[in-house]
Curated annotation (Swiss-Prot):
Guanylate kinase-like domain boundaries: 14-193
Compartments it resides in: Cytoplasm
One family name in Pfam for this protein: Guanylate_kin
Organism: Mesorhizobium japonicum (strain LMG 29417 / CECT 9101 / MAFF 303099) (Mesorhizobium loti (strain MAFF 303099))
PANTHER family in the record: GUANYLATE KINASE (PTHR23117:SF13), GUANYLATE KINASE-RELATED (PTHR23117)
Keywords: ATP-binding, Cytoplasm, Kinase, Nucleotide-binding, Transferase
PROSITE patterns reported in the protein's UniProt record: GUANYLATE_KINASE_1, GUANYLATE_KINASE_2
Source species, domain of life: Bacteria
Annotated protein name in UniProt: Guanylate kinase
Primary location group: cytoplasm
Stored NCBIfam families: guanyl_kin (TIGR03263)
Record family assignment: Belongs to the guanylate kinase family.
Amino acid sequence: MVPRDLGSRIRRRGLMLVLSSPSGAGKSTIARNLLESDSSLELSVSVTTRPRRGSEIEGVHYHFRTMREFERLRDSDALLEWAEVHGNCYATPREPAELALAQGRDMLFDIDWQGAQQLKEKMRADIVSIFILPPSMKELKARLKRRAEDQEAVIETRLKNARNEIEHWKEYDFVIVNDDLDRAFAEVRGIVVAERLRRDRRPGLFDFVSGLLDEKTV
């Protein structure tokens, strides 16, 4: 009897799912829902030079490193992408990503367009990039206000930055307008399912098809 989940057992290479959006467009919520609903997807843990905060755990929230350690990683090409933000450095470590891909595990990257560009320069064939847009700038402002996290001046700065980020939408493989969170999540989930089935990500298909053609039916 052929097992019902035979297709999922065919060996495949993992993928790197890149999610980007301006602040308030829903990226973090969609990413969290993906991680909670899909055990085959794991969040890429960044390296940072910023000090650890109270409840943060090494290797779970970040890999905390000194500036000297960070520079050593950068200079030895151990980072896939990096950026300096407010005086602290953040980066994606190469080794965990490459290991996950080889083992058929998928990694989620919650990064901006600059980080996405750097990842594509080094790992283009493995990347599935999705940009999430708000339905309108007015709605984006309303969402930022509803979060009640920032002063008005900060919100205006976020909106200005959002326009700059949105300018890069054409650099992504897929673009989703998040006017309904459930629908946007379903669309992202559908992209992940389809991309996992791409022939070039499933090297195990060669052995499977070879065995299929050699199989005797009598």
